[in-house]
Amino acid sequence: MKIYLVGGAVRDQLLNIPIKDRDYMVVGATVQEMLDKGYRQVGKDFPVFLHPKTQQEYALARTERKTGVGYGGFSVYAAPDVTLEEDLLRRDLTINAIAQDETGRVFDPYGGQADIEQRLLRHVSDAFVEDPLRVLRVARFAARFQPLGFKVAPETMALMQRIAASGELEALTPERVFQELDKALSTEAPQVFFEVLREAGGLAILFPEIEALFGIPQPEQWHPEIDTGIHTLMVLEQAARLSQDKQVRFAALVHDLGKALSPKEHLPKHHGHGQKGLPLIRALCERFRVPNDYRDLALLVSDQHQNIHNAFELRAETMVKLFDKADLWRKPERLPQLLLACEADCKGRTGLKERPYPQGAYVQHCFELARNVAIKPIIEAGFKGAEIKAQLHKQRVEVIDQYKRKTAVNAKP
C-alpha cells in the first residue's frame, strides 16, 4: 500500500502558490484494509475515505470507462492492481496528473511539469472527450491561471470543440454548470472563462443569451469597443477588479442581455434594454437554479443601471422611488453592490477603465440622507396610517432635493 499526494496540491506546490486542499491517492489497498486502519468511507460512486485524524480525502486508485452520456456516464474500477500511472491517465489535464510520494519524490508520467513551465493547459489523453464537464473545467482553469500566463493548448481546444459539436454539453446538469460558473466568477479573470467557452463552441449551447450579444453594435460615441459581447466581458473584467463579490460579478455579466432584443432598425441604439433583459435574466437563473440573491441583484442592476449612470440628472422624486423599488430601506447592503456593478459597466469600455465614477458616491450619499429621515417626529406630529408613509416619502424627497440644489450651486464656476 502506497500513498501519494495528487492533483491540485502538487500542481500548486510546483507553481509556488498557496495550496487549498490536499487530496491523496492510495495504490495497492482494498476497501477493507482502509476501514481496518480507521478510515471512514464517504464516496458513493467510488471508494473515497476520510483520514481518521486529519479528515483529508484519500481515494483508492481507479480507472474509469465510458458507459453512457454526460459526465456521470462512467463505470469505475477501483482495486489493488490499479497502478499510479493508470489512475493519473484518467485525469483531465497534465498539470493535474502529477503525484508525489511520502518522501517528496515527484511522479510525472504525462509531462505535467513541462506544461507548467510552458504555461499550457493540455489534456492527458484522448479520453478527455469522454467527459463534457471538462470543457467547463478547462475554461475555469484558464480563468484561474490567466494571471500566470496559462493558455489552452491548441490540440486540447480542438477536443473541446469536438465535445461541443457532439451535443454532450446538453447532458450536463444545471447544478454542475452553475457550480463551474460560480467557481469561475471567483477567479481573478472570470471573463476568460467565457472567452474560452466561446472559442470551444460551448457558449452558444450553455449560455445562448450571452452568445447572442456578440455582433450586436452599440453607439461608438459611448462604446469605442462597439460590440456588445466584447463590452460585456470587459464589464465582467472590471467587476473582478473592483470587487471580490461573486453576486456583483454575475450582475455585471448579465446586465446588458436586453441589447440582444433591440430591433435591427433601431441599432446601434438600445432603448429600454435594461427592462427588456429582465425576462432573460429570470429565465437564465431559473435554468441554472441560480441562488435568489444572485438573481435579485442581477435584476436590480439590469433595471436601474441607466438611472445610476444618469444620477446627477435624476429628480429627487425619481431617486427616492428608485430606493423604494430596490427595497433598500430593508436591504441597504444592496446599494454598494448595485453601484459597483454600475461602475464596472462604466469602466468596461475601450480606453475608459480608469475613468472616475462619481455617481457612486453621490447616490450613496443621497441614500444616507434619505435613510436618516426619522419617522418618530412624523408620528408625533399627528400623522396616521398611510399619511405617515406619504410624509416620510415627502421628507426624503425634500432632503435629497436640498442636497441636489446645494451641490449644483457649488459646482458652478
Curated annotation (Swiss-Prot):
EC number: 2.7.7.72, 3.1.3.-, 3.1.4.-
Any GO molecular function: ATP binding
InterPro entries for the chain: CCA_bact, HD/PDEase_dom, HD_domain, NT_sf, PolA_pol_head_dom, PolyA_RNA-bd, tRNA_CCA-adding_enzyme
Gene name tied to this protein: cca
Miscellaneous comment text of the record: A single active site specifically recognizes both ATP and CTP and is responsible for their addition.
Cofactor: Mg(2+); Ni(2+)
Function per UniProt: Catalyzes the addition and repair of the essential 3'-terminal CCA sequence in tRNAs without using a nucleic acid template. Adds these three nucleotides in the order of C, C, and A to the tRNA nucleotide-73, using CTP and ATP as substrates and producing inorganic pyrophosphate. tRNA 3'-terminal CCA addition is required both for tRNA processing and repair. Also involved in tRNA surveillance by mediating tandem CCA addition to generate a CCACCA at the 3' terminus of unstable tRNAs. While stable tRNAs receive only 3'-terminal CCA, unstable tRNAs are marked with CCACCA and rapidly degraded.
Keywords: ATP-binding, Hydrolase, Magnesium, Metal-binding, Multifunctional enzyme, Nickel, Nucleotide-binding, Nucleotidyltransferase, RNA repair, RNA-binding, Transferase, tRNA processing
Residues bound to ATP: G8, R11, R91, R137, R140
Organism name: Shewanella loihica (strain ATCC BAA-1088 / PV-4)
Family membership: Belongs to the tRNA nucleotidyltransferase/poly(A) polymerase family. Bacterial CCA-adding enzyme type 1 subfamily.
Keyword RNA-binding: yes
Co-factor remark: Magnesium is required for nucleotidyltransferase activity.
Assembly with partners or alone: Monomer. Can also form homodimers and oligomers.
Chain residues that bind Mg(2+): D21, D23
Name assigned to this protein: Multifunctional CCA protein
Comment on protein domains: Comprises two domains: an N-terminal domain containing the nucleotidyltransferase activity and a C-terminal HD domain associated with both phosphodiesterase and phosphatase activities.
Domain HD span(s) in chain numbering: 228-329
Binding site for CTP: G8, R11, R91, R137, R140
Catalysed reactions, as listed in the record: a tRNA precursor + 2 CTP + ATP = a tRNA with a 3' CCA end + 3 diphosphate; a tRNA with a 3' CCA end + 2 CTP + ATP = a tRNA with a 3' CCACCA end + 3 diphosphate
